[in-house]
From Swiss-Prot:
It is an enzyme of class 3 (hydrolase). It catalyses: 4-imidazolone-5-propanoate + H2O = N-formimidoyl-L-glutamate. This is Imidazolonepropionase. The lineage of its organism: Bacteria, Pseudomonadati, Pseudomonadota, Gammaproteobacteria, Vibrionales. PANTHER family: IMIDAZOLONEPROPIONASE, IMIDAZOLONEPROPIONASE-RELATED. It is found in: Cytoplasm. InterPro entries: Amidohydro-rel, HutI, Metal-dep_hydrolase_composite, Metal_Hydrolase. The keyword Cytoplasm applies. Pathway: Amino-acid degradation; L-histidine degradation into L-glutamate; N-formimidoyl-L-glutamate from L-histidine: step 3/3.
Length: 402
């Protein structure tokens, strides 16, 4: 027996059920990293050493399903320039923008990338996160994309957390392929994806499908290559315009479409006819001072599951706090606190391809939990800057975050 929790008020977050589903104080028996038994009256073996939650709320461990937390360099100077009204095109021409992060990341060693990522990861863990998705996309060469993915996977060796890695080589056009985007897509499909699959460095492949990124046709090529190598797909779609990338991703069985500020009703209907999750990224919306909001009412009307994530990255969402994103989901996108908690638990698990073992509290599920010093779950999206986390449990192992 690995762990026993007693007097735990559970917020089970089972999908498809209304409300927080708060239970009376329960006992949880955890064995081999999974929840084996839940009940009010369970006979414990004589050698058990139960941990009393003393009536504290216990939720599923939070899941940050979209991050770029492995990178080198800073974009703080770019932030200042943007506030002064300098256009992004001018910043990029002066060596700034995403390619400045690419240059810094290429120069950094795998070990340096790990050290730089750990403080960002620590911020997420302090907000109750137990699972994190990490994308590549700042290398844009075979060598550097592999380096980023290896660094991301290595984070599990330094912190008690579950890392899911995603290949995002189709994030931007590297300088070496300027004016030859189709050639770069061919390089991704023929060289990068096969190597990533062979070394099992990622479970999914993402594409920035946008007017300043890659076309729908190019995105489809990458998706076909990914699926041919047994990898899942997902898309950065409809952030700046409505190209139809979300509908493509849904039609091809993608895990999630992310950003989606410009998603139209036809795109929402395409999501509703699939199992693809709509991932909202309020941090980027806020940081870029956008005004076009995701179509929340349509997503509700057509019952499309919504996830929320930090989109932690140096250029458009430098935030390492998932509770802040929950608050922004409420204040900027008019979600309810219940919707935001669902968005970082069961729906986020679905967005990563883990709907059957993460994101809710139920027998047989992974023992990834967060124990909170709060009276009601709405407090998680209500107050920002004061940690209410008592402890995390990852694979049945207790961890206290300072």
């Amino acid at each position: 027996m690995n762990c026993v929790l007693t007097e735990a008020r559970l917020v089970t977050m089972q999908p498809g059920v209304q409300g927080y589903q708060i239970t009376e104080p329960q006992t949880l028996i955890i064995e081999q990293g999974r929840i084996q038994h839940i009940g009010q009256h369970i006979d414990l073996p004589s050698d058990a050493h139960p941990i009393s939650c003393a009536g504290k709320l216990v939720t599923p461990g939070l899941i940050d399903c979209h991050t770029h937390l492995v990178y080198a360099g800073s974009r703080a100077n770019e932030f200042e320039l943007r506030l002064q009204g300098v256009p992004y095109q001018t910043i990029a021409a002066q060596g700034g923008g995403i390619l400045s992060t690419v240059n810094a990341t290429r120069k950094a060693s795998e070990e340096a990338l790990i050290e730089l990522a750990l403080p960002r990861l620590d911020g997420l863990l302090r907000s109750g996160v137990t699972s994190v998705e990490v994308k590549s996309g700042y290398g844009l060469t075979l060598k550097d994309e592999l380096k980023m993915l290896r660094a991301a996977k290595a984070l599990e060796q330094h912190r008690r957390v579950k890392i899911t890695t995603t290949l995002l080589a189709a994030h931007a056009l590297p300088p070496e392929f300027q004016g030859r985007s189709d050639d770069y897509i061919a390089h991704i499909c023929q060289e990068i994806i096969p190597r990533v699959a062979e070394e099992q460095l990622a479970t999914s492949v993402d594409v920035f499908c946008e007017s300043i990124g890659f076309s729908v046709a190019q995105t489809e090529r990458v998706f076909h290559a990914a699926q041919a190598h047994g990898l899942q797909i997902k898309g950065h779609t409809e952030q700046l315009s409505n190209l139809g990338g979300s509908a493509l991703t849904a039609r091809m069985g993608g895990l999630s479409v992310d950003h989606i500020e410009y998603l139209d009703e036809a795109g929402v209907k395409a999501l509703a006819q699939s199992s693809t999750v709509a991932t909202l990224l309020p941090g980027a919306f806020y940081f870029l001072r956008e005004t076009q909001k995701p179509p929340i009412e349509w997503l509700r009307q057509y019952r499309v599951p919504m996830a929320i994530s930090t989109d932690l990255n140096p250029g458009t969402s430098p935030f390492a706090d998932l509770s802040l994103m929950m608050n922004m989901g409420c204040t900027l996108f008019d979600l309810t606190p219940e919707e935001t908690l669902r968005a970082v638990t069961c729906h986020a698990a679905q967005a990563l391809g883990y709907p059957a073992n993460r994101g809710q509290i139920a027998e047989g599920y992974d023992a990834d939990l967060a124990i909170w010093n709060i009276e009601h779950p709405a407090e998680l999206s209500y107050q920002v800057g004061v940690s209410r986390l008592h402890a995390r449990i990852v694979n049945g192992e207790l961890s206290y975050e300072s």
